[in-house]
Amino acid sequence: MKNRFLEADLIIVGGGSAGCLAAIRALELKPDLKVVLFEKGDIKYSGSIARGMDALNIVAIPNFTTPELYVEAVSMGCAGILDAPASYVMAKRSFDLLKKLESWGVYFPVDKAGQYRTLQYHAKGRFLTAMEEPNLKTMIARIALDKGAVAVNRVMGLEILMDSGRAAGVAGLNVRSGELVVCRAKAVILAAGGTARFTLPNSGYLYGTFDYPGNTGDGYVMAYKAGAALTGMEFSRRTLLIKDANMPLLAITVTRGGRVMDIFDNIIMENECHSLSRMEEAFAQGRGPLRIKLSHLKPEVIEEIEHILFTTERPVQERFFKGRGVDFRKSDIELWPTECQLCGGHGMAGVVVNEKAETTVPGLYAAGDVAAVPKQHLTGAFVFGEVAAERAVQFIANNESVMLDQGQVKVMEARRNRLADTSGREIDVRDIEYKVRRLIGDYVVSPKNEYKLKRWGEWAERFRDELEKGVLARDGHELSKIYEVEHIVTCASLSATSALERKESRWGEAHFRTDYPARDDKQFFCHMVVAKGESPEHIRVTTKPVIGMDGKEVRS
């Protein structure tokens, strides 16, 4: 298997929402900058919005709502465990982002008075702003490429290259050929998404996940190995979605008057989407399956919902519902809890960053689902993609070139070759992934307790040994799957270790410990922070105080 060497000023890992916006912003600021993107899929149709999007979940529209109110609302949704400065910056920049998207041709509906269509999503304020853009991903990818960014498709990130404690580039793997792709760069932006393939979805399909199945925690693991801190990893989120399809629709249907009902026809949620814990409680109490009722709505509202669902984010829904014989005017939509995931966009897990998208490693920035800006959604990916680019461009201007650590590359090359050697290996990589994710569901996610979390530690050691010595890679694609499963195992260990130390229950089903069922603000009103210890297998856990709008520590 070959090696390929590249040079860049800035390398971005991940060509999704955050990655594309980072590339665009960097080249707006410095058009002659050499920007390279590593993308596991194809930049045109990859990431969590492979097609289009129906809304910006967070826009603080001037004279209508405020960034301060958004911070208050999202803090409530995070049970207080939220650093305000980053969320404030995101909300403050959100309206300018909307206007920028409009200038690119993105359509945001307005009423007869020229006001944007806003919907109730958060506990306070109407920040969710309707958008109808079925070609959003191809649009931002095209703009990034037109400005001069170079997309290296089919390459997953493996490690951050280091030079005297500073990020100095990225080494990745071509997911088809197994080629090692090494790019030296003066700054690195991680935008590689969360961990979608964490537990198994209820359908049983390995890749039938709610979020982009290419997201296997690559960015989390790269940051961790480079010495960066992560937080919120104990927040293992799942939601109730369309049964068997695992596609999102709550923010589209419920905010427009749809009703989430239990089997006794009690209304669980209506006209807002911030009460997800009530859905979890109803299902846990045996009042499921839950369903969304739309038949009571006016015909024009149902038509609007159909138009959005069938044309924008996941158009395959039209074929799915037709195949199931579901007509929203007559039939309800059945919901079911799906797989757990780790994610900074919908959840709280990610690389520790400040309001400047800076990690704890010089020259390394993070944006989007890989970054711990809780519940930032698409707005956060776009805003912090830009913020990361702005800081990276400034860092590049103020710092000298970096050296390529040939020793680090040789170690990676030797391991790649060892994993690709088929002799003595017979375990199918799909089989071990299934078992890994099944046991994550058994031991790592809620309901949690000390025994289960420690049992995962024992299994993780066994899985690491099997991945190193027994899993067969018949081609470059299967080789990339070995690395993906290894990343899933590492993410599960980070999650379990963090959950073990948070000896309380918080965030509903996202972190419920049967041995510590109560919330304990006195001891655990703080961030759990994990970082690499003496070796990658040794996870060090510390706590970090919650930071308020004034930059000072917040007490419960």
Give residue spans per PLM region.
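An anion/pyrophosphate-binding glycine-rich loop and adjacent beta-alpha core
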Residues: 222, 228-342, 391, 395
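Short, well-ordered coil/turn residues at beta-beta hairpins
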Residues: 14, 185-187, 191-192, 367-368, ...
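Conserved redox-cofactor binding core of oxidoreductases
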Residues: 45, 97, 102-187, 191-201, ...
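N-terminal Rossmann-like FAD-binding beta1-loop-alpha1 element of flavoenzymes
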Residues: 10-37
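Conserved N-terminal glycine-rich FAD pyrophosphate-binding loop of Rossmann-like flavoproteins
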Residues: 41-72, 250-252
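Conserved FAD-binding subdomain of flavin-dependent enzymes
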Residues: 43, 61-107, 225-232
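Glycine- and aromatic-enriched mobile tails/lids
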Residues: 1-9, 22-25, 42-47, 100, ...
